[in-house]
Amino acid sequence: MSEVTQGPRSSVFTTMRFSKERGLFLIEHHIARMIEHATQLRIDATAISMDSIVQLLRQNPPEMVEGLLRIEYTHSLQLRISYRPFSIQNEQVDAVTLPSPIWPARIAGTKHGAWDAYIQARQHAEQKGADLALMVHEYSIVDGDRCSPLILDEDGVIWVSDSNTSVDSITFKAIHDWLLDAGFHIQHGRLNERLVARCVEAVAVGSGVGVLKIDSIDGEPIGDGSSRLFDCCNSCLERLYNGSENWDKVWS
């Protein structure tokens, strides 16, 4: 892993699920986002390709059967990889809030090289006995430390942050249409205090966590105790995980 003290244009990265047997999960989506973010960060994305990544992975296979793969591409055109086990998956969690780092428009919303604020936010949450840090800007939740928050209101509308500091979630995009098919409506807007305080349910989705049901924020209970959105996200993810077309083999 790169030094977290690097500047934002030092590298671009992504994190995805891997299975030694099945390969890489939604890798094409991750590569597309890496290229988009690299371009935004003025990093030459020429070497970000399936072939270059697979070659590096085969030279450095994982010791664990499954887990998370972090792929980083530096401004000096180097690919780096690291593996780690899952920490928390598809569980009920408690969250705390922290101020979101604010970057210039060309940096905001990218998975960039100065990711220390998010790493520290996660560590702060764990020190407080919580599982998740939610990043707040102008009294609204804009992101999670490693996942994207979704807020369900009493009218069945799922609210997603429209802030330019929010990182586009590959996981959310993958289940988006299934959520619509399940009868939810989806709206982008501000996840402000009033919306969150009155919500029916709050969850967070991401490659590293699957889906998390947020039961409390800063010690205050959230939602009415129902789990319709959590259950639906869980079901959608299971369908994705079980679809062979969503995996690209690497080691077998």
List PLM regions with ranges.
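Short secondary-structure junctions
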Residues: 60-67, 182
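Helix-start/capping segments and mature chain N-termini
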Residues: 1-58, 74-252
